[in-house]
Curated annotation (Swiss-Prot):
Gene Ontology biological process terms, A to Z: L-histidine catabolic process to glutamate and formamide; L-histidine catabolic process to glutamate and formate; putrescine biosynthetic process from arginine, via agmatine
Family: Belongs to the arginase family.
Pathway: Amino-acid degradation; L-histidine degradation into L-glutamate; L-glutamate from N-formimidoyl-L-glutamate (hydrolase route): step 1/1
Source organism of this protein record: Staphylococcus aureus (strain bovine RF122 / ET3-1)
Top-rank taxon, per record: Bacteria
InterPro entries: HutG (IPR005923), Ureohydrolase (IPR006035), Ureohydrolase_dom_sf (IPR023696)
MF (Gene Ontology): agmatinase activity; formimidoylglutamase activity; manganese ion binding
Protein name from the UniProt record: Formimidoylglutamase
Keywords, in A-Z order: Histidine metabolism, Hydrolase, Manganese, Metal-binding
EC numbers: 3.5.3.8
Substrates-to-products reaction catalysed: N-formimidoyl-L-glutamate + H2O = formamide + L-glutamate
Cofactor binding note of this UniProt entry: Binds 2 manganese ions per subunit.
Residues that bind Mn(2+) 1: H130, D155, D159, C242
Gene, per the UniProt record: hutG
Length: 311
């Protein structure tokens, strides 16, 4: 079920009503009905769409609450300064789960997300469970039907479980099994968060991955080269971040908290090798769970990631 953006979420400190250099995002955001959006001849600006769904987390036996994530992120983002002076920033609202099967909600989200991707220079998809990634893939493939897609996931988990239905832990297996013209790179894998069968599947499918342990002090030149080579080898990049990759000291409000997770600045350093590329069609950020957040710490962290990713 799709609902348009809620203006009441977008509030913040007012420093000026006339000087754009003192504006914050709540002063520049606009609201549109994505279901009625016509294709633009020239993509421009930024589109934001929320995936207010945690059914996939429940099916994956995780702790629910991430369906409240998109609104919490938008509220935190609203008060940040508009340093980029975006040519356009549109909140398209959220998609909610009201179908019998999760896959139908994912398809509905994908149809709408594809419109944003086709019309904007940047599209941010805010979760919600990490089943958003499969929906993001469907949207990407709709916009780019023949191009090679490189999927980059900053995550503690492979999320390549073999299940009978979509969950927050199956997205990347679904993508790889359905589409031979895709490849998968995972940054931040937790050795204690993935079974041997998942490592075996990674070997079988030639999934490139980097352990969290390799990213704790710095991002080495070897890893930077790996990322840049992966971007270079693909026509389109689908970029996604699962917030459970970040240590729970910084990100307590997630579906599955990390005890040996990454520092936020490490995630930013990794993203610097990805975001600047014009090949990046969309960015999704998943598993922000306000139910377990402290002082809105995780919501603010996601908001600041989006803020840093703006071009």
């Amino acid at each position: 079920m799709y609902k348009q953006g809620e203006p009441n979420l977008w509030t913040g400190r007012l420093d000026s009503e006339t000087d754009p250099k003192k504006f914050r995002h709540f002063q520049t955001v606009t609201f549109e009905d994505l279901s009625k959006l016509e294709k633009s001849s020239r993509p421009s600006g930024v589109g934001i769409l929320g995936y207010a769904v945690d059914e996939g987390v429940a099916l994956n036996k995780g702790r629910i609450g991430a369906k409240e994530g998109p609104d919490a992120i938008k509220q935190a983002f609203a008060g940040l300064p508009d340093l980029n002076q975006c040519e356009a920033l549109v909140d398209y609202g959220n998609v909610y789960h009201d179908h019998e099967e999760l896959i139908d909600t994912q398809k509905e989200f994908a149809m709408l997300a594809a419109k944003s991707i086709a019309n904007h220079r940047q599209t941010f998809l805010l979760g919600g469970g990490h089943d958003i990634a499969y929906a993001q893939y469907l949207a990407t493939r709709k916009v780019y039907p023949t191009q090679s897609i490189g999927v980059i996931n900053i995550d503690a988990h492979f999320d390549t479980r073999a299940e009978q239905q979509s969950t927050s832990g199956t997205s990347f297996r679904q993508i790889l099994e359905e589409d031979e013209n895709t490849d998968y790179l995972v940054l931040g894998i937790a050795q204690g968060g993935n079974t041997q069968s998942l490592f075996d599947y990674a070997k079988e499918k030639k999934i490139d991955y980097v352990f969290a342990d390799e990213l704790l002090s710095h991002v080495s030149p070897t890893i930077k080269d790996m990322i840049e080579r992966f971007v270079h080898e693909h026509d389109v990049i689908m970029f996604t971040i699962c917030m459970d990759v970040i240590d729970s000291a910084f990100a307590p409000g997630v579906s599955a908290p990390a005890v040996l997770g990454l520092y936020p600045h490490t995630v930013l350093e990794l993203a610097k090798r990805i975001i600047p590329s014009d090949k990046v069609s969309s960015v999704s950020i998943a598993e922000m769970n306000p139910t377990y957040d402290a002082d809105n710490r995780t919501a603010k962290l996601v908001a600041n990631l989006v803020h840093h990713f703006l071009k």
